[in-house]
Amino acid sequence: RNKEKNKNEFTCEKPQHILAEIFYAFANALSGQRNYKLSNFYINLSKYLNPNFLSYNALLAENLVMLKKYDQARKIYEKLFDAGSFYKWHSSKEVALILEVQDKKKESIKFLSKAYKNIDVNLYRTFDLANFLRGHEKYEESIKLYSEILSKINEDHTLYPKVLDRRGTAYERIGN
């Protein structure tokens, strides 16, 4: 299990860390404008100024996916596995989507299912996996996960109606 905290180093006492954050803000804005190459330039400046702030890599990988540089993006996402449980799950989902784009559907499902077994599981991550499996026509597996979630939450939980609806849809798809 991946129980360590997310690993990012930042201190306001270091001017280079502050400058790195400013460049990252530029990179984020440029990415939002679909200027991925220039965004990557600013991300790389940020990484140079603060190489111990691993979160910069998430935007870099997202930009590379948008530029259809899937293998480079995957390598970055795999490095993010070590940045903490949040990034491990986020990166695993993104790698699964990359595999899907590369017409590796079975490998995608297997990859995300395996990653799920090696993270700190919570309701939302279970819901993510159940949705992913349902979207890939793995209805029985998704029903098990939806049922597991329902057994752990009350009817007034925000996830309850969504889980109930999606489980019902999965049942409909298999004819039950």
Residue positions per predicted region:
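TPR-adjacent "capping" and linker segments in tetratricopeptide-repeat scaffold/adaptor proteins
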Residues: K7-I22, N154-T158
